[in-house]
């Protein structure tokens, strides 16, 4: 399986989630299963079956996160010398050439993407157009609504 890029913040968030799942939810679910067992007949015990189902979902999420972390190539963009070039992990200010509207995006891994939070996937059309370009460059982004031209205003390593 190939490694996929992830920011330091993305890896930290996944590690915190695993810690919460293992340290808080897992013990709570085990307790709920134990309490449901005490109620008697397990065949028709809705509380028991609900707790077991929740346990399965939590364990699956733990396995999923651990697999992602083991296959992640964590990239600390702050450790890379600033060159004005757009690379994975950089935060980029771009201006729409037509409307002069400026937006800021951080280029992150697929699992970290959150457009409302200003984080776009490295595989998104905007990120693919920006990667490798430098401050001052004009880029053409192909979108479903048509081509949009942007100018790279600033590239930051934060």
Swiss-Prot record:
One of its GO terms (molecular function) is DNA binding. Residues 53-73 form a coiled coil. One of its GO terms (biological process) is regulation of DNA-templated transcription elongation. Keywords: Coiled coil, DNA-binding, Transcription, Transcription regulation. It comes from the Bacteria. Pfam families: GreA_GreB, GreA_GreB_N. The keyword Transcription applies. The keyword Repeat does not apply. Necessary for efficient RNA polymerase transcription elongation past template-encoded arresting sites. The arresting sites in DNA have the property of trapping a certain fraction of elongating RNA polymerases that pass through, resulting in locked ternary complexes. Cleavage of the nascent transcript by cleavage factors such as GreA or GreB allows the resumption of elongation from the new 3'terminus. GreA releases sequences of 2 to 3 nucleotides. Belongs to the GreA/GreB family. This is Transcription elongation factor GreA.
